[in-house]
Amino acid sequence: MINEFLGQPPNASSHGYQIDHILEFCHWFMAALFFGWSAFFIFVLIRFRKRVHPAADHLGVRSGISTHLEFSVVLIEAVLLLGFAIPLWARRVNQFPPGRDALLVHVVAQQFSFNYHLPGPDGQFGRRDVGFVSNSNPLGLDPNDPAGKDDIVTSGELHVPVNRPMVAELSSKDVIHDYFVPAMRIGGDAIPGSLIPVWFTPVKTGSYEVICAQLCGLGHYGMKGTLVVDTPQDYQAWLKERAELSGGGQPAAPSPSPGGQQPQNKPAAPAASPSPGG
């Protein structure tokens, strides 16, 4: 209840209820602290006002109640952190779905949009190299790599199937961004030179807002996108449409790599996705 009051959108992922429970507990705990300490503050203002105590008392409070209250607050916070927050975060970080079951998507952030790279029917990502980056090829897909001929590249909007785990591997072309999908209760930094995985399982069809949660420049306010959760049939139709529009994800004409260097395979292969417990 308090989460909705504070503006949190309805949960649309399988794990989101765990996040919501701990957030709601924290909010109620903070509310209790706020009203409790506010009442104590008002009591002190009245109890020790100048008219009743014209001379300052340098000994202070002689009762041990305040000390007990402080220790109780510290104990509750320690239980909340060690008993709930850390185990929940450990499960989110370490227990990835099996690679064969999950949809693997590379999310490449740039000022000021999110680009998505999906493998084609062969299940393999094509090579990417900065030497091939252009306005028509924002991810630098190697046009000479057979594995990338059927790849799908899209910007701003990503479609995923409902009830299927998704692993998003985050990276960036320029500065640090943060890929945040509030309805899915996931977020992660997109850092140049790093590949940072986050995962979730969408359980409700619909369109959900994607935002950048890291100040990344003058256009940060407009760095938004859409995550569309489809039925399996609609998702397959979208894949077919994107494959036709992108011509297999490849730019029309090949361009050589600068300096005659051989392009490197930048993205990780699908089999490299983290496995449960690792």
Question: Which residues make up each language-model segment?
Answer:
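Alpha-helical transmembrane segments
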Residues: 23-36
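Central hydrophobic cores of alpha-helical transmembrane segments in multi-pass inner-membrane proteins
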Residues: 36-47
